[in-house]
Amino acid sequence: MKTLAPSYLKHQFLIAMPHMADPNFAQTLTYIVEHNEHGAMGLVVNRPQELSLADILEQLRPDETPPASTLQVPIYQGGPVQTDRGFVLHSSECSFQASVALEGLSLTTSQDILLAIAAGVGPKQSLITLGYAGWEAGQLEAELADNAWLNCPFDPEIVFGMASDLRLEAAAASLGINLHLLTSQAGHA
């Protein structure tokens, strides 16, 4: 009997099913940063907070007034883990002190990227979050088996090119799915 290798979801979207009961993830679209035998890490990309980059910069540098343009840069709720820690998902034409290369993207956790974005010399595309979503080994696989999530290929246009309130539906539409027509009942063969 042939054993199948596990299928991991790194660099894909997770689409919360309409019946998702967990308030941390109901109606969310999550970008999977890492997924392997040890667990998974992702960033929710469609939940803006009532914070802007200006608010963050005021906390980091209280003696300086942030540029007015930073009032228009939203901060997203990336997930329920380490909600005081910032993560910036961005295009990879720039690198910073604490950047990790992803597939065509980078993830940065150092403050230098925030200052670069504020100065207008940051990456062309970026999304700033506080916190992340984390799953222990096997946890995400179990949630997928329980039909809590759909997955689909990552599309940078969804994250960087459209309003946050359109992202979940756009990801589902990329699969030909209208989330409003799905049932919470599922069968297994």
From Swiss-Prot:
Give one Pfam hit by family name. Answer: DUF179
Could you name the domain of life of the organism this protein comes from? Bacteria
Matching InterPro entries: AlgH-like
A single Gene Ontology CC term: cytosol
Family, as annotated: Belongs to the UPF0301 (AlgH) family.
Protein name, UniProt field: UPF0301 protein PP_4995
